[in-house]
Amino acid sequence: MIKQRTLKRIVQATGVGLHTGKKVTLTMRPAPANTGVIYRRTDLNPPVDFPADAKSVRDTMLCTCLVNEHDVRISTVEHLNAALAGLGIDNIIIEVDAPEIPIMDGSASPFVFLLLDAGIEELNTSKKFLRIKETVRVEEGDKWAEMTPYNGFSLDFTIDFNHPAIDSSTQRYCLDFSAEAFVRQISRARTFGFMRDIEYLQSKGLCLGGSFDCAIVVDDYRVLNEDGLRFEDEFVRHKMLDAIGDLFMCGYNIIGAFTAFKSGHALNNKLLQAVLAQESAWELTTFEDEAEMPLAFRAPSTVMA
């Protein structure tokens, strides 16, 4: 039986909020089988829970938010959600003493490190996967994203940025997903933005935590970060990281192929909601025999250790 996963122990870290620029304490706790992914704001009295759910997602200019029926929100969940998807963690309570998850270095890598430091525990309950049975596609202008049936999880992402720092040969990235591939090839890719946009937002009291420490910053001609890029195609790898986190908002690892052109958080979520709304397009499945499970979801010892 392929089992659900949670953490072995509580793990805690501090970081800076992208919006407020203030210190945020992040605490991640193990959770019982079938709990799902729960984000919790402990700065509110009483604390407010936000279950990861496709219909609760709101896209903003700066990040992805989860919003409840009272219009209370928790922001900047996307990179941590990608780390959970990458490691296949089904059940977890994520607490912050602020209205946002800390931005850390702008990638998912610090969250991967914390989750692996906590250790991954298998629970004695079957893990559910969402298997794509029919092609579903969404479009907005020249942007599009689609899911198709595939016995694994593959991603094919293309961006289209006309910028001297983003070479045309580095605007497409393909990945046959596994936990190991995610950690090594995707998790370290950072978010990016224009210096002029960051300066404008900060003049309006927004994006106060934005800096060279948590993003790739570009001007009209070049990358401004002293250390440059982590990958020559870091921009498109980060967009794929975002998509992995966005698609995991359904609460299950997906068995299917994701292809996108110029997609972002809003379109990724629109695709996920379109899939879920078309009941014939998907099914939940479990695996009693590990040999039947797609290779994509077999946790390598290098990641699970």
From Swiss-Prot:
Pfam families: LpxC
Annotated catalytic residues: 265
Presence of the UniProt keyword Lipid biosynthesis in the record: yes
Protein name: UDP-3-O-acyl-N-acetylglucosamine deacetylase
Highest taxon above the source species: Bacteria
Entry's Gene Ontology BP terms: lipid A biosynthetic process
Biological role stated in the UniProt entry: Catalyzes the hydrolysis of UDP-3-O-myristoyl-N-acetylglucosamine to form UDP-3-O-myristoylglucosamine and acetate, the committed step in lipid A biosynthesis.
Membrane spanning residue stretches: none
Family per record: Belongs to the LpxC family.
EC number annotated for this UniProt entry: 3.5.1.108
